[in-house]
C-alpha cells in the first residue's frame, strides 16, 4: 500500500512539473515533434 502511494505521488509530481514546463514555453516545436 505504501509503494502505491509513493508511486502515485511521484507520477503526479512529475506530471505537474512537465505541464508547468510545457505551458511555460510556447509548444510550437514540441507539437511538431510529437505529431
Curated annotation (Swiss-Prot):
Keyword tRNA processing among UniProt keywords = no
Q: Which UniProt keywords apply?
A: Chloroplast, Membrane, Photosynthesis, Photosystem II, Plastid, Thylakoid, Transmembrane, Transmembrane helix
Q: What is the protein's major site of localization?
A: plastid
**GO CC terms of this entry:** chloroplast thylakoid membrane; photosystem II reaction center
Q: Which InterPro entries match?
A: PSII_PsbT (IPR001743), PSII_PsbT_sf (IPR037268)
Membrane association type: Single-pass membrane protein
One Gene Ontology BP term is: photosynthesis
The compartments listed are:
Plastid, Chloroplast thylakoid membrane
**Residue intervals passing through the bilayer:** 3-23
What is the annotated quaternary arrangement, including any partners?
A: PSII is composed of 1 copy each of membrane proteins PsbA, PsbB, PsbC, PsbD, PsbE, PsbF, PsbH, PsbI, PsbJ, PsbK, PsbL, PsbM, PsbT, PsbY, PsbZ, Psb30/Ycf12, at least 3 peripheral proteins of the oxygen-evolving complex and a large number of cofactors. It forms dimeric complexes.
Which family is it part of? Belongs to the PsbT family.
HAMAP family hit by this protein: PSII_PsbT
What is this protein's function per UniProt? Found at the monomer-monomer interface of the photosystem II (PS II) dimer, plays a role in assembly and dimerization of PSII. PSII is a light-driven water plastoquinone oxidoreductase, using light energy to abstract electrons from H(2)O, generating a proton gradient subsequently used for ATP formation.
The protein's name in its UniProt record: Photosystem II reaction center protein T
Organism, scientific name: Houttuynia cordata
The organism's lineage is:
Eukaryota, Viridiplantae, Streptophyta, Embryophyta, Tracheophyta
